[in-house]
Amino acid sequence: MTRKRTGVPWMPAPEFARTLSGLTVNLLVRSVAASLPFYTDVLGLNLLYCDEDFAALEGPGRWHMMLHADHTLDHSPMEIARLADLGKRGTGAEIRILGIDPDEVEARARARGFTVNVPAATFPHGWRECRLEDANGYMFAVGVLPN
């Protein structure tokens, strides 16, 4: 694995792995630094650590999301070939997050130039949500259960 990090990471990877439980989302991104504003400024996730290779974030309820830069997967030719495809990443998948105010997320996303695919609305399935995408094209639906 190619690493661009020059310093010492915040904790050894096996130690961080032991802090995870349940579902953890790990997304491959072109640039960790360019990707972070969506996750921290728009979604409001807590940044635990970041460097040029990797970022660890925490959401409401202590779930985790990780970002790995493309260059960290140079040991996996199949992944590298898939990442070379110019289409949007994650096509066909939608990451749904319950517990984040969709109206606030939509406003922050628009203010920062991110694509909002579906404005905040209350849907028949019971969520008030908005649907948007990050700088890499990953699709998110964020919402709450209305009172």
At which residue positions do the language-model features occur?
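Vicinal oxygen chelate
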Residues: 2-24, 46-98, 104-133, 144-147
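Short C-terminal beta-strand
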Residues: 139-143
